[in-house]
Amino acid sequence: MGSRGQGFMLGCCLLLAVTWGPVLSLVPRVQEEQQEWEETEELTSPLDHVTRPEETHKRYSPSLREGLPTSRCYRCCDSNPPVYQTIPPPQINITILKGEKGDRGDRGLQGKYGKIGSTGPRGHIGPKGQKGSMGAPGDHCKSQYAAFSVGRKKALHSNDYFQPVVFDTEFVNLYNHFNMFTGKFYCYVPGIYFFSLNVHTWNQKETYLHIMKNEEEVVILYAQVSDRSIMQSQSLMLELREQDEVWVRLFKGERENAIFSDEFDTYITFSGYLVKPASEP
């Protein structure tokens, strides 16, 4: 090797010494600071894990950041922060807790009336009350009786119009409810009455009469033409109101119509009486 080769080797050695000298001098310092940082980390409580790694690195190795060359980057970081399991806050079941009884509140407003309920069962009979005082005298009661029975001793023949049968003999006429001049019974005591009519037919003539209530034909008494005369009767019950009229009517002369009687015997009778007054229950 010549002098040129030796000079080249010497230049290379000087270049290496200049370049790596500062770096090699920092290695012991980095190792000391790293050991010191590990000892400090062991003494740190678990809550320090939440500290940012950059702050920890700056705190424990400030000289390293200042001494390293600006052309290279060195970073020391902690491991990932621990994951803590989220525990839900405790809940209290207030339905099982019972507090002290409060004060009575104010009375509220009256509500609306409800619907009418069904009728309840009949109650027990109460005790008998005391006897009351005597009342004032009442009105005089009306007569609760009515009866009549009348007869006719003259024969009657039909003509061109209807004829009321008028009677000339009075057997019973209680309180004069039967009018002998008109031949009609007038009701003064409302109620139920019984009436009967008896006549004697005429030979070879028809017998045709009606028992009338006011102007209404109620029942008929009828006998056909016959060679022999006979007694014929009709009866019924009527419910009358006050001022109703009951009478006997002979049919008009479209056909030969007659009833027989004479002055020696009474062949025609008309009777009636009150069975039950309307005022009685």
UniProtKB/Swiss-Prot annotation:
UniProt cross-references to SUPFAM superfamilies, sorted A to Z: TNF-like
Residues spanning the signal sequence: 1-25
Organism domain of life: Eukaryota
UniProt feature coiled coil, ranges: none
Domain annotation C1q: ranges: 141-281
Disordered, as annotated region: 36-64, 107-136
Entry GO MF terms: collagen binding; identical protein binding
Cellular compartment(s): Secreted
Bias kind Basic and acidic residues: ranges: 49-58
Biological process terms in GO annotation: negative regulation of platelet activation; negative regulation of platelet aggregation; positive regulation of aldosterone secretion; positive regulation of cytosolic calcium ion concentration; positive regulation of gene expression; positive regulation of MAPK cascade; positive regulation of phosphatidylinositol 3-kinase/protein kinase B signal transduction; regulation of glucose metabolic process
An example Gene Ontology CC term for this record: collagen trimer
Pfam families on file: C1q (PF00386), Collagen (PF01391)
Domain Collagen-like: 99-140
Residues annotated as glycosylated: 93
Stretches that traverse the bilayer: none
KW Hydrolase (keyword) present: no
Alphabetical keyword list: Collagen, Glycoprotein, Secreted, Signal
Keyword Nucleotidyltransferase found: no
Protein's name in the database: Complement C1q tumor necrosis factor-related protein 1
Source species: Rattus norvegicus (Rat)
Lineage of the species this protein comes from: Eukaryota, Metazoa, Chordata, Craniata, Vertebrata
Gene, per the UniProt record: C1qtnf1
